[in-house]
A protein has these predicted regions:
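Structured C-terminal helix/loop/strand segments within mature extracytoplasmic catalytic/sensor domains
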Residues: 302-368
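Active-site-proximal alpha-helical segments within enzyme catalytic domains
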Residues: 141, 184-191, 231-252, 306-323, ...
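Active-site Gly/Thr loop motif
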Residues: 216, 264-318
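A small/polar active-site loop signature that marks catalytic segments
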Residues: 145-221
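Peripheral terminal and inter-domain segments
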Residues: 22, 348-511
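Active-site helix/loop module of the DD-peptidase/beta-lactamase fold
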Residues: 86, 105-143, 167, 198-235
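Active-site SXXK
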Residues: 46, 68, 85-111, 138, ...
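A short, well-structured edge-of-sheet supersecondary motif
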Residues: 49-80, 315-318
Length: 511
């Protein structure tokens, strides 16, 4: 199904009424229910969680909504229910929603030509393919551009990114070839901003976020002040579930339409072929910034396992955040473990399994670093500041300030002229703050001695998918720090090494 015309005036007036009425609604919260009351066994959910912990490295949160009620929810500490998590490309589905709302308000159509929105950024001699590119082609990632031409798009550059996009080669007729295209999502955001006078995040405020009870989120923007569109949104797990429930209900929310059902149908249908494999959930077709899945489901997803999965046949929504390199593995677990357990009617009460599930969900924890509380090297390392050779992370020095009998260790890492303090202990997480890439963010640390000369420090950036492991090897006056990250856009493994030497005793603590 496609949408080619502006909706009539009545629909536009309806959208305006929705915006005006958003502030009058009571704050929304999902009702909670037992799994059995909604047709799924607690034992099956427990089996899914156990399998995920063994097979996926690692889920950060999980929420299952059935018949409009939350039947299971859990966060692996230090990740928490009230903390936002970066969405990566799951942001695209929200950008698509902004386009749908703008279409409903008569501000554009999916058949509008892209060049028409940006007359001042059109190349001197635009190709026929560029001239033919429509909003629909941006939505379906069928712009006609080659992958190598959109790689390394400079999202945070000073230059005009709209002009940059329009200058890229368009080798194929738009609408004929699927190529995953995050710059196209940026262009959708730019178009929404052009026709509404608001960034996507501000435009969605009264139209989506407020009615769904989503606190005003952070959405990263380009230096031109345009929400990045294809990534950069930060929201909570329950916010993902609410968004999925809106789509499951075909745009209805608390008995009122927020999003036209025709848009929901078009956005989540197969608009573009993206492969022919019957076993890949990345080749079942693509809608308007939504993926089709096997078994007739659909989803929005983001790098390293951020998921909003809608199961219309089962009246269910699954929201997941994670930090994994095995995104297909997460979906396969859901298909294999959860889908067969979704029954059409309520099940008999199973108090024993229900209690075990509740206990499991309340005690979830990301594996903390194990280790000994002390070692042979600890005595000589404590209290010394090691000056580091120049490195890409701008880390200048590291010091093990203290360590107690239980192994609780205090570290100071000096980065870009500022001291950052961490406390870590074996088998537990200790929260702190670190400045990473110039931005302060909350983290949690754990650590212990994993060899006589080695202290292993694990730092979870618990609003992101990322966990960084620092292995500090002490030898005399020298320390070598190997750093690894659980997930990233490059191959796994060590991504940097710092080498440092202890300052003379007289200068310890002088900085």
């Amino acid at each position: 199904m496609t949408i080619t015309r502006r909706l009539p005036l009545a629909a536009s007036l309806l959208c305006a009424a929705i915006v005006l009425g958003a502030a009058d609604r009571a704050p929304f919260t999902f009702p909670r229910s037992t799994p059995e009351a909604q047709g799924i066994s607690s034992a099956a959910l427990l089996g899914f969680i156990d399998a995920a912990e063994k097979q996926v490295d690692a889920l950060h949160s999980f929420m299952l909504v059935r018949h409009g009620q939350v039947v299971a929810e859990g966060w692996w500490s230090p990740y928490a229910a009230d903390e936002p998590h970066v969405m990566y490309s799951l942001s695209k589905s929200f950008t698509s929603t902004a386009v749908g709302l703008a279409v409903a308000e008569g501000k554009l159509t999916v058949d509008d030509l892209v060049l028409g929105f940006f007359p001042d950024s059109v190349p001197a001699d635009p190709s026929a393919n560029l001239r033919a590119m429509k909003v629909r082609d941006l939505l379906t990632m069928s712009t006609g551009q080659h992958d190598e031409d959109i790689q390394n798009f400079p999202y945070l550059a000073d230059e005009n990114l709209v002009k940059k996009f329009l200058a890229l080669p368009v080798a194929h007729k738009p609408g004929t070839l699927f190529v995953y295209n995050t710059p196209a999502s940026y262009m959708l955001s730019a178009i929404v901003q052009k026709v509404t006078g608001q960034t996507v995040v501000d435009y969605l405020g009264p139209r989506l976020f407020e009615p769904l009870g989503i606190k005003p989120p952070v959405w990263e923007a380009s230096k031109q002040g345009i929400s990045l569109g294809g990534f950069g949104l930060n929201i909570r797990t329950e916010d993902i579930a609410r968004f999925g429930q809106l789509y499951l209900q075909k745009g209805m929310w608390q008995g009122k339409p927020l999003l036209p059902a025709a848009w929901v149908e078009a956005a989540t249908s197969r608009q573009m072929s993206n492969g022919s494999s019957t076993t890949s959930d990345w080749e079942q077709g693509y809608g308007y910034q939504f993926w089709r899945c096997r078994h007739g489901f659909y989803r929005g997803d983001g790098a390293f396992g951020q998921y909003c999965i809608i199961l219309p046949q089962y009246d269910a929504v699954i929201a997941i955040t994670s930090g994994t390199r095995d995104m297909p593995g997460v979906l396969n677990l859901i298909w294999d473990r959860l889908i067969p357990a979704l029954k059409p009617a309520a099940l008999s009460t199973d108090k024993a399994s229900s209690d075990r599930l509740a206990s499991k969900l309340s005690g979830l924890m990301l594996p903390a670093q194990a280790g000994e509380p002390t070692s042979a090297a600890a005595k000589s390392a404590v209290g010394r500041r090691y000056t580091l050779a120049p490195n890409a992370q701008t880390a200048e020095s590291i010091a093990l300030d203290s360590i107690d009998a239980r192994g609780e260790a205090a570290f100071t890492i000096r980065t870009a002229g500022a001291d950052q303090h961490l406390v870590a202990a074996p088998g537990a997480w200790r929260k702190a703050s670190m400045t990473i890439n110039g931005v302060a963010e909350p983290v949690a640390a754990s650590g212990g001695w994993t060899a006589d000369d080695t202290y292993t420090l694990k730092v979870a950036r618990y609003r992101t998918p990322f966990v960084i492991t620092y292995s500090l090897r002490f030898a005399g006056d020298q320390v070598v720090v190997d750093t690894e990250q659980n997930a990233g856009f490059s191959e796994p493994g060590r991504f940097s090494q710092w080498v440092g030497r202890a300052q003379p005793a007289a200068t310890q603590g002088s900085k």
